[in-house]
Every structure is written in C-alpha cells, then in structure tokens.
Amino acid sequence: MKINKNSAAAKVPFIKPNVNVMYQIDFKRDDSKPKDPETNIHKYGCNFMCCLAVPQFMNKKKLRSSQIIDIYLYAVKSGWIEYDCTVIKPNEVMNYTAQVLGDKKYRYANVFVKGIASDLDWNVSNYQHTSDLPGNGNIYFFIVDFLTGSSGNYGGHHFELYNSIGTLMYDPANCTVHKYKGVNKISCYKVFLKK
C-alpha cells in the first residue's frame, strides 16, 4: 500500500512504533478452552491487538499482558468485541485502552472503512482529496484486513497496522502469517487532540 510521496497524505505526521508492544503469539494457547482470553487473543486477536497498539504508540507506554486481558474482558462485557476477538466497536476499544494508559491528550476515531472487493479501482491516494482527511497536522493510520484463504488460526483474515504513508508499523502475529490472498478492507482512523 503506497501513495505518492508528494501528495497531501505523505505530508501529515504519522504514528511511530516507539515501544515494544506485545504480539498475539505472546499469549498462551489452550484449544481445550474455547472462551479463554489468552487462547482467543493468540488465535484471533490480530485486529484487537492493532486497536491496542495505536494508543500505546501515541503515549509511548506498553500494556502488560494482564492489562490486555482486562481490556479484552471489559470489551467483551461491553459488547465492543466478541469472545473470538471480532472487533465490533474499534473506537471504543482504542479509547478505553487510552484511558487505561492514562491518556488525556488523544481521542481515536474511525474515518471510513473501504471494502476493496466492492471498489477495485480504489487506492490509498484517493483519500487525499476528502475534506476530513489528511491535512492540518492530523494523524492518520490504517488497519488493513488481509484475506489469508484459510480458516485456521486467523479465521481466514489477518489484520496489520500501517501509517498514513503505507508503511507497516505493527504485525500482531510477528510475521508468522506469510500468505495473503488479497485485501478485504481498509479501515482509516484519525487521532484527534482532546479539547
């Protein structure tokens, strides 16, 4: 996912991976416990872990595994994610994570989700002319949903975090997923300063 280096999108600030955040494979897996938080984070937690990574990078603070499990349990109870880590309300997950980290400066929000299968001509540079997108020093990032073609550990999908110029910032599987069948969708997020 690359954009023109001279575009407006290339000139916005972007998140830097400045802390060593945990990977989903750092959590122990026990297939005999289908609703075990660690097992579900290990097997299916890539999108969930991407949502947790952004506030950690913005605040330069790393969550402990116990905090991640607490966030998982709270998010399930609140209806923001399902037990299998399917993220339903990413804004709430990110903003609650920021709260756990003591973040009083930033707010995180989804700007748009673009299904690639529904618009094969779309590419990342298309967003640079949208009024709400890059410019004015705003920080943007993408969570990309890749199709893996298997229903194994990652349920046929794998999610990775990219900055606004298309550079991979975080792979929650720590590069253990190697074969992609294409992109399913791209979710664009914006970091706002709280007022």
Question: Language-model segments: which ranges?
Answer:
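Active-site-adjacent structural segments surrounding the nucleophilic cysteine of cysteine proteases
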Residues: 1-84
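Conserved active-site-adjacent core of cysteine acyl-enzyme catalytic domains
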Residues: 55-195
